[in-house]
Amino acid sequence: MMGRLRVRDVLNEIKWSGKYRASDVEVYFVSRGYRNDVEKVLFTDILELRRGSIIIRRNHEEKYIPHHRILRIAKISGETIWSK
């Protein structure tokens, strides 16, 4: 799935296609203050896919992540599905 696909398209494919198990997919994004300023969440922690962002659940709170901050989407095994 690598290439010039938009992150939104990749997120929707993971959610709807059945090609991937959401519990086996991690999303890496820029998050100031985290180690190397990168945080990751399981795809199952995504509460909502929006046009230009995702909403995640983190420590019992919702967090807004714009698409431009997403750096990489990968399987837990390390295989990259999409990267910036």
Model regions: which residues?
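Short, compact, well-ordered microdomains
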Residues: 52-84
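N-terminal recruitment modules of adaptor/scaffold proteins
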Residues: 2-61
